[in-house]
């Protein structure tokens, strides 16, 4: 429990930030899930749309500081690699 007014304010601010960060992280998870489902279906057009959406969502999360930029880059790289694998196998 906060003892001072400034500590109470910091607690309120932290709760607001946490709620915002959780929302952003949830969006990232949803975008990644949609991409993985598109990859599993084997639809190249849907996969490309989902990949673009996931990249955008992850990039925004990194720019807001929710994800570290290197972690975001690693996620995007791995997702792009996974999305490219079925396309390469089809050729």
Curated annotation (Swiss-Prot):
Gene3D superfamilies: Ribosomal protein S20. GO terms for cellular component: cytosol; small ribosomal subunit. One of its GO terms (biological process) is translation. Keywords: Ribonucleoprotein, Ribosomal protein, RNA-binding, rRNA-binding. Residues 1-28 are annotated as: Disordered. GO terms for molecular function: small ribosomal subunit rRNA binding; structural constituent of ribosome. The keyword RNA-binding applies. The keyword Ribosomal protein applies. It holds the Pfam family Ribosomal_S20p. NCBIfam families: S20 (TIGR00029). This is Small ribosomal subunit protein bS20.
